[in-house]
Amino acid sequence: MIEGLDNPRLDELYPMEVGELRDGVELIRGASHPFELDSFLAGMQTPVFFGSGINNFGVQEILEALVQWAPPPQPRDAGARMVQPTEKAFTGFVFKIQANMDPKHRDRIAFLRVCSGMYESGMKVRHLRLNRDMKLGNALTFMANERVASERAFAGDIIGIHNHGQLQIGDTLTEGETLGFKGIPYFAPELFRYARARDPMKAKQLQKGLEQLGEEGAIQVLQTPTGRLLLGAVGVLQFEIVAHRLQTEYQVDALYDPADIQTARWLAFPDDATRKRFERDQQMRLASDVDGNPVYLANSRYNLQVTMEDWPDVGFIATREHGQRLEQG
């Protein structure tokens, strides 16, 4: 092993390449900040590793850094209080949903992070959003394409739960305590397209596919007064990815039509009377999201600003938590 860029052995063994190596390292050092472990643990800094998996170069260094630097499970904000990872009672939240991980079985997996306590296969937990008990069983852990059944999991572990529609991103599961883990933001979309199937006979497949992809968070699916499927995104690439997945996973060739919408905001009303007046006045500019929250669709920034000024008591919200049902009055 050769240690240090100034080691003369480098010049002996690699006389043609050593100059470029030193220049490259100097450039990287000049363009970045020195690594500080405290900043990394505080979420203020991310280390960058250079390597190649196919050449097995740098892989060992990444693994060693994970072992050395990765922090233990941290306390998490659950709304009513902070949940400590050392607590005995089980708590966890769903942070990701992935459909069709096994295309042969059309399965959907909800990825759940255990925040405290211990998961045991077959245990009964409280689903806070649905306000009912459910049984957790047949959990999985993943390594590349391999799945392994998990009988137990502890704070900091991530397990996959077979999902038949009862779990959504942001859902909190506990052994009975009323909590709600936070920190999974949902941003108001800035780009919009109407979706339709090239083959009208596949309209139901399109609807089902978009519902499942919407549950993942791959795209936002909004229900409009006209019944047309409206998709909202924060980047153009989302539309391309969704079209590709609809074709490969649901055998639906989707087409996009332009929408006269520039931005959107979730709505929060102070009382039922205000809500009804707003709905009468803005009927054709309203939609609802996957969680049933009302959404205002603005055809311009100016239109949004004027509407906000005309309705000062109504909350126009640009960011909300995943799975959050906004209180209305």
Where are the regions that the model predicts?
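Structural and coupling elements of P-loop NTPases
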Residues: M1-G329
